[in-house]
From Swiss-Prot:
Keywords: ANK repeat, Coiled coil, Repeat
Keyword Repeat: yes
Protein name from the UniProt record: Putative ankyrin repeat domain-containing protein 20A4
PROSITE patterns per record: ANK_REP_REGION (PS50297), ANK_REPEAT (PS50088)
Repeat positions for ANK: 66-95, 99-128, 132-161, 165-194, 198-227
SMART domains: ANK (SM00248)
Superkingdom of the organism of origin: Eukaryota
């Protein structure tokens, strides 16, 4: 099996989940999966590829077991000659492999620019996606190859292509922290207003992945700083929640610049509107009334026009102009200015002039009695309105503070409860799952805190808006008595019969002022109505939000109670289990002591039997020596009587030998029985020691057990040494018997030569047969001892393996204990 890797350059990303898709470029190739043309394409042998195509033209688009063509493999390995050959033979350019990647995607993935250019020139589609939703442009962004990206865009690659996470190449470059690619894509007019699945803008992602350079680039592009994601958070909130002070300062400075520009634009539009209004009023009135007009415009117009309405900073200019000029034309659509003006401030001033003339015409035929009644009603209602407004404001402020306090206290309660759960509930999850769970809970808590702070800020801003609106209402109501007093003066002047020309001029000025004030009051009333409607809608929305927050708080309290009950139950259950384990530990310790005592007894018995066996062996060796001496004496003496005595002595020696062999067999039987007992006890000891190991792992008492295992290991080594000594003794005895057999064979040869000593020959033959039997018995014993030695070696090997396992388990327990203490 051969493995080939292509394009080993790797990029550094901010997310670990991206790496497994974009790094490790190239195919994992096995010879068994390839045909001849595929092997030639991998090697870059263009001549071999031509030969394969000449033999079989159908192999041009042949697929291997991974659905790859020769073009895929040639592009991945960067063999330009093979790619040009296959493309000129008109192979399929947009074939997909198992990962739905085309040869173009694979060439860009492996950063083989020459192959990618050839494919693009021959009509490869750059907008096809793989199983991850990535186009060739996404891979070019990841490898930070601007030349490849430029060629893809010049051949019709879609600059706003989306992957599975709805990331455009620009957003993907921001996620991977590729500043060069961000600048390049923005130069190529990539949309900076694109958002991902969570409606996060490019600026939010740059803040989230802590890349101040990209933030600076985006702010220079005049990106929308006030854009919000699904949770209602903007880029500044992301910087605050991730403690990125530098990026937060950048965003704040940019916001200040925007606000300064808007204020300057609003001020200029206000001044132009006031000047246009003043000129229009001067043109419509006679020359004698200029002074009164200047006074009226100073008192009324600048205060109402220049004061900005509450709202977000990027909507202030529009609201100021529209608020002053939208009200009256809605009621009187037939009234239109004679000239169309492009500036919105000028339009507002023209509309205001038309409204004032209309109000002046309507106000002339009004009866004096109705005006007096209105004046009295307004004087009665004014203190009540002030008190009602103040009470409403105080109630709303208290309500918003209560909401923020309840949400913050609920979040803090949830934080402390989750921390308690993390401390007192450690054994429910494994370590890794617990760490991931703690990280997720901390992130959720931080997000909830930021959301609560944002809600609190929004509520404060809205309350400040409402205060400004109520102040406007009070100012409007304060202007009403002045208007009514002016009307009363004009009526009294009309009722007096002796009024002169000067009084007529004063009355004219008062009437003009009255018309202006009425128009202002009408505009203010309309604004107040719209504001009241907006306030009612917002109040309803806030009431709904309060209900939702209360429901969530109730659900969280229930969840906390359930968690507390579960924790108490689990703690009680684990306490019971711990007590049971302690009792079992004591019981196992007692059993282990008993087993140790029985083991000592068995060892003492074995030692006694070994001493007996040694004595029997020594007796046997002495009998062999006596037999040898007797045989030598038999050779020397040829006397019949001596031979008879020797034969009797030999028979006695044989009887003794038989008796000793019987004793030896009995001792061996006992020895085998003791060995069986020892094995059984050893097996039981092993089982109980394993059980004790599991208990002591839970109670961190494995060190004592390691010492016991060391002692057992030393005892087993001593036994092995004893068995090896026995084996050496047996081998020596076998050699000795073989020598005796050789000597007896020589004697037999000598005796056969002598015809007179037939009886001696028969006796010697019998002795030879018996010695052969003894040799056979001793060989069987030696085989048994060898088997026992092998068995003991296997047991030693098992003990060593168990010892290593115990050491590993001890280390793991220590590591888990230290990690738990740290947590």
């Amino acid at each position: 099996m051969k493995l080939f890797g292509f394009g080993s350059r790797r990029g550094q990303t901010a997310q670990g989940s991206i790496d497994h898709v974009y790094t490790g470029s190239g195919y994992r190739i096995r010879d068994s999966e390839l045909q001849k043309i595929h092997r030639a394409a991998v090697k870059g042998d263009a001549a071999e590829v031509e030969r394969c195509l000449a033999r079989r033209s159908g192999e041009l688009d042949a697929l291997d077991k991974q659905h790859r063509t020769a073009l895929h493999l040639a592009c991945a390995s960067g063999h330009v000659q093979v790619v040009t050959l296959l493309v000129n033979r008109k192979c399929q350019i947009d074939v997909c492999d198992k990962e739905n990647r085309t040869p173009l995607i694979q060439a860009v993935h492996c950063q083989e620019e020459a192959c990618a250019v050839i494919l693009l020139e021959h009509g490869a589609n750059p907008n096809l996606k793989d199983i991850y939703g990535n186009t060739a442009l996404h891979y070019a962004v990841y490898s930070e190859s601007t030349s490849l990206a430029e060629k893809l865009l010049s051949h019709g690659a879609h600059i706003e292509a989306l992957d599975k996470d709805n990331n455009t190449p620009l957003l993907f470059a921001i996620i991977c922290k590729k500043e060069k690619m961000v600048e390049f894509l923005l130069k190529k007019k990539a949309s900076s207003h694109a958002v991902d699945r969570l409606r996060r803008s490019a600026l939010m992602l740059a803040v989230y992945y802590d890349s101040p350079g990209i933030v600076n680039i985006l702010l220079k592009q005049n990106i929308d700083v006030f854009a919000q994601d699904m949770c209602g958070r903007d880029a500044e909130d992301y910087a605050i929640s991730h403690h990125l002070t530098k990026i937060q300062q950048q965003i704040l400075e940019h916001k200040k610049k925007i606000l300064k520009k808007e204020k300057s634009d609003v001020g200029s539009s206000d001044e132009s509107a006031v000047s246009i209004f003043h000129e229009l009023r001067v043109d419509s009135l006679p020359a004698s009334d200029d002074k009164d007009l200047n006074v009226a415009t100073k008192q009324c117009v600048p205060e109402k026009v220049s004061e900005p309405l509450p709202g977000s900073s990027h909507e202030k200019g529009n609201r100021i102009v529209n608020g002053q000029g939208e009200g009256p034309p809605a009621k009187h659509p037939s009234l239109k200015p004679s000239t169309e003006v492009e500036d919105p401030a000028v339009k507002g001033a023209v509309q205001r002039k038309n409204v004032q003339t209309l109000r002046a015409e309507q106000a002339l035929p009004v009866a004096s009695e109705e005006e007096q009644q209105r004046h009295e009603r307004s004087e009665k209602k004014q203190p009540q309105v002030k008190e009602g407004n103040n009470t409403n404001k105080s109630e709303k402020i208290q309500l918003s503070e209560n909401i923020c306090d309840s949400t913050s206290s609920a979040a803090a309660g949830r934080l402390t409860q989750q921390r308690k759960i993390g401390k007192t509930y450690p054994q429910q999850f494994p370590k890794k799952l617990k760490e991931e769970h703690d990280r997720c809970t901390l992130k959720q808590e931080n997000e909830e805190k930021t959301n609560v702070n944002m809600l609190y800020k929004k509520n404060r801003e809205e309350l400040e808006r409402k205060e400004k609106q109520y102040k406007k209402e009070v100012e409007a109501k304060q202007l009403e008595p002045t208007v009514q007093s002016l009307e009363m003066k004009s009526k009294t002047a009309r009722n007096t019969p002796n009024w002169d020309f000067h009084n007529h001029e004063e009355m004219k000025g008062l009437m003009d002022e009255n018309c202006i004030l009425k128009a202002d009051i009408a505009i203010l009333r309309q604004e107040i109505c719209t504001m009241k409607n907006d306030n009612l809608e917002k109040e309803n929305k806030y009431l709904k939000d309060i209900k939702i927050v209360k429901e969530t708080n109730a659900a969280l309290e229930k969840y906390i109670k359930l968690n507390e009950e579960m924790i108490t139950e689990t703690a009680f259950r684990y306490q019971q289990e711990l007590n049971d384990l302690k009792a079992e530990n004591t019981r196992l310790n007692a059993e282990l002591l008993k087993e140790k005592e029985s083991k000592k007894r068995l060892e003492a018995d074995i030692e006694s039997y070994q001493s007996r066996l040694a004595a029997a062996i020594s007796k046997h060796s002495e009998s062999v020596k006596t037999e040898r001496n007797l045989k030598l004496a038999l050779e020397r003496t040829q006397d019949v009587s001596v031979q008879v005595e020797m034969s009797s002595a030999i028979s006695k020696v044989k009887d003794e030998n038989e008796f000793l062999t019987e004793q030896l067999s009995e001792t061996q039987i006992k020895f085998n029985a003791l060995k069986d007992k020892f094995r059984k006890t050893r097996d039981s000891l092993r089982k109980k020691s394993l059980a004790l190991e599991t208990v002591q792992n839970n109670l961190s008492q494995t060190q004592q057990q390691t010492q016991e295992m060391k002692e057992m290991y030393q005892n087993a080594e001593a036994k092995v040494n004893n068995s090896t000594g026995k084996w050496n003794c047996v081998e020596e005895r076998i050699c000795h018997l073989q020598r005796e057999n050789a000597w007896l064979v020589q004697q037999l040869d000598d005796v056969h030569q002598k015809e007179d000593h037939k009886e001696i020959v028969t006796n010697i033959q019998r002795g030879f047969i018996e010695s052969g039997k003894k040799d056979f018995v001793l060989e069987e014993k030696s085989k048994k001892l060898m088997n026992e030695c092998d068995h003991l070696k296997e047991s030693l090997f098992q003990y060593e393996r168990e010892k290593t396992e115990v050491v590993v388990s001890i280390k793991e327990d220590k590591y888990f204990q230290t990690s738990r203490k740290k947590i």
